Amino acid sequence: MSAAPAYSEDKGGSAGPGEPEYGHDPASGGIFSSDYKRHDDLKEMLDTNKDSLKLEAMKRIVAMIARGKNASDLFPAVVKNVACKNIEVKKLVYVYLVRYAEEQQDLALLSISTFQRGLKDPNQLIRASALRVLSSIRVPIIVPIMMLAIKEAASDMSPYVRKTAAHAIPKLYSLDSDQKDQLIEVIEKLLADKTTLVAGSVVMAFEEVCPERIDLIHKNYRKLCNLLIDVEEWGQVVIISMLTRYARTQFLSPTQNESLLEENAEKAFYGSEEDEAKGAGSEETAAAAAPSRKPYVMDPDHRLLLRNTKPLLQSRSAAVVMAVAQLYFHLAPKAEVGVIAKALVRLLRSHSEVQYVVLQNVATMSIKRRGMFEPYLKSFYIRSTDPTQIKILKLEVLTNLANETNIPTVLREFQTYIRSMDKDFVAATIQAIGRCATNIGRVRDTCLNGLVQLLSNRDELVVAESVVVIKKLLQMQPAQHGEIIKHLAKLTDNIQVPMARASILWLIGEYCEHVPRIAPDVLRKMAKSFTAEEDIVKLQVINLAAKLYLTNSKQTKLLTQYVLSLAKYDQNYDIRDRARFTRQLIVPSEQGGALSRHAKKLFLAPKPAPVLESSFKDRDHFQLGSLSHLLNAKATGYQELPDWPEEAPDPSVRNVEVPEWTKCSNREKRKEKEKPFYSDSEGESGPTESADSDPESESESDSKSSSESGSGESSSESDNEDQDEDEEKGRGSESEQSEEDGKRKTKKKVPERKGEASSSDEGSDSSSSSSESEMTSESEEEQLEPASWSRKTPPSSKSAPATKEISLLDLEDFTPPSVQPVSPPAIVSTSLAADLEGLTLTDSTLVPSLLSPVSGVGRQELLHRVAGEGLAVDYTFSRQPFSGDPHMVSVHIHFSNSSDTPIKGLHVGTPKLPAGISIQEFPEIESLAPGESATAVMGINFCDSTQAANFQLCTQTRQFYVSIQPPVGELMAPVFMSENEFKKEQGKLMGMNEITEKLMLPDTCRSDHIVVQKVTATANLGRVPCGTSDEYRFAGRTLTGGSLVLLTLDARPAGAAQLTVNSEKMVIGTMLVKDVIQALTQ
């Protein structure tokens, strides 16, 4: 083979006779040269049938990428091997594709079906890599495929794949922000995941997509706090940052009553005699004010957060320590914030980059919490090896920590720093001395004298900076320092730094009455060199001339006119403008303007002394540790730190409902005894529980790998509550283990609720607070009624296994509505027709029932009676044509009022619908009396997609946000055709329009009756006559687009079968195959 010689040549060898030998790196193999023949050899190696050659080629290609070489021209040859059976080759192919898929989008799109198959690979690394490649293809046309892949991966048994799904969410959101509602549902589902591997990634996705949806965190707050210690380091940083913002909105400020407590303590210690002398009136006033000042009691969840983050101060990661430090600074009481000082000081031994960030934050903290870092003053002393930016930041911290006790030590340090060779550092030190003199009055004279001594320094920059600082200090006590002003005036001949010269001129002009003889002479010298001065100096010369003209016009009138004449023709616009303005103001014209009379007040008005403040003073409004705080400017994507609430929000929103869990488990155990058919199939637990299931449930987990959910329905709140409570209580006792078994069997039977029906009330805080007590007060008889209803509805329960895939994600509430439902007659009759369909002996007898709708799913909850404050709402897909529009899915909405008051004005509010989806609202229900039920019909055009229809269910007083998401089988209508027509249409839909999967039918699903029932319950398809007894054909069309959907099931002996779906809509075909296989294999 032609590739073999090149392959051995790459390994290196000796040169031929008479040729010089060249040494080369055997690792490179000559691959990294610009010789295109090398790449041709790699392409040949990738085209061979030998996995060993392919593996070697991929290793070299990945090595090229690692060394920064361009390997994009190999994309066609590499992408062909994505379907290679060798797992090691496939891994490296995906590594390559993740790197180049975004650059070679057109070629990547050609292999998109292969990537989709990779999502179902048994190896979790391949599934995750396939999802990473899909999310790297930044083409809007594949958004539906990406959404489907993310939903499937979110239900994957592997935590690593679910983590990758969380990473893909922000990528899809940045590509198409219209998918936000569906992505929020996936985020809500992943937030309920108990796996530490997923927690950080999903919180990052939450922060990117919907940081305002703080209600998604309520039920998962305690779980996140408890998992925090075990999450990977970057995940800890993200979670802590998010929980900081969450806590600022849900808890009261721990420092709100500190001033009041200090006043009371001082009063109790000193003012006992004064209190006795006070009149009764003052006592009454104090008594009236007392109820409004309640003592602060920390919320237990607030304490939980502080307690669980404190150990992370010992983390090896500087980012984690910094995150905990900012959390304590923003959330902890003053008495507890001090624990972060030692951890931050420890970080100062790290790299200079880490020191820079830490010192930025310490500088901000030390302004408000000076006492926190005072014991560690020596840790901020400057080393000669420190970079300049580190020195300046340490200087900032030392200045902030200076007080009357430690100022002698600090000033001695500053004296040493002034001798440094780093001029920027010396200038910052002089500024720091000026700030110390401003803040501590008793050392002001000492600092001023030291700065005056620096005026004789040989370094002009040191002298210039000293002049600027002296100018600011002299403004505080100008009358006492006339000699210093004279000394500065003498320096005008020597100092050439513009800022220093400008400062001296300003001082002389401002306090010219203290140096009446020197000031005119300085003006004379400056007039000589006016044209050669910098602009900032020229402006101060004009100011000096104006002030001297107003105070000593006899000596300076001509000089002032000369300076103004020079300035009038200066090149700088500002100087010319200032000269004209000043001339009109100080030199009276013939008319005598009104401003001229007040010129002295304008120029010689007393000015307040400048306040020397830290540049970090106003940075504390940014969240510490953020990029915005580092830059002192709001960065893109920065989330503002919320203000503390004035009143404590309802803490019960973070509670979990235990009673509902217990009752549900017991009821499902009773149902299991009555229905052994369902106990044969292995129970499925939610995707979040599979990661940490018991060893005893391994077989159960294995069965789940063939039926991973991809419907994208979000986990409900009650499931989140159950998981969190289960985590807190543990699983030690036998009773708890039995509850765990009940939970799995419960989730096995939930499939009756196939489509998604999530509801969130605007007043979720208040409704959830009463949910626990309401559920606890319900009697056992009330709980048995829904169970009996479930048993009395054969069509729903029989079709349940066919919908189990969707129900994995829809565990919002295990308790069906308490009101006895009345099924529409049409549903019952069609279900009976479906039952009879499997009993026919000839194909001709199938024709009358082919087009009759079959009830696929039972009632599904739209609004729980607790969240709806007594209003319970369910819905069913009736599979009957909607009278208003044949393209719409007919949905029956069932209302029930379990409250004590009538509910008035039931109607649909403003819908929030994705593009293409429309709703035909049901007529308004004027009133629903207590205990009564009502049914309405509405139509929804899902536009041949499984995107949820989100809308508001409104009454006269409340609005409830609800969502209906259809299973893929409800998006089509049955079609009648002959066998020949079926084969003809199937021949047109081959290639990429055909999806084939093999499966093994269980013993309970090998009769014609069961097979037909399960398929028609899963999808609204019509049966097509077939000449053979071991083959089943079904046909239908999508409601909106009218696209043909053909399904063929070829059953073989011993239970082996092959399922084929032909449809031009690949996404619908893929989802339908998955649903039907799951229904048939249960």
UniProtKB/Swiss-Prot annotation:
One Pfam family named in its UniProt record: AP3B1_C
Family, similarity comment: Belongs to the adaptor complexes large subunit family.
Function, as annotated: Subunit of non-clathrin- and clathrin-associated adaptor protein complex 3 (AP-3) that plays a role in protein sorting in the late-Golgi/trans-Golgi network (TGN) and/or endosomes. The AP complexes mediate both the recruitment of clathrin to membranes and the recognition of sorting signals within the cytosolic tails of transmembrane cargo molecules. AP-3 appears to be involved in the sorting of a subset of transmembrane proteins targeted to lysosomes and lysosome-related organelles.
Tissues where the protein occurs: Isoform 1 expression is specific to nervous system. Expressed in nerve terminal and cell body, and is associated with nerve-terminal vesicles. Expression seen in Purkinje cells, cortical neurons, neuroectodermal tumors and graded in cerebral cortex (deeper layers exhibit stronger expression). Isoform 2 is expressed at high levels in brain and testis.
Example of a GO cellular component annotation carried by this entry: AP-3 adaptor complex
Name of the featured protein: AP-3 complex subunit beta-2
Compositional bias segments (type: Polar residues): 790-800
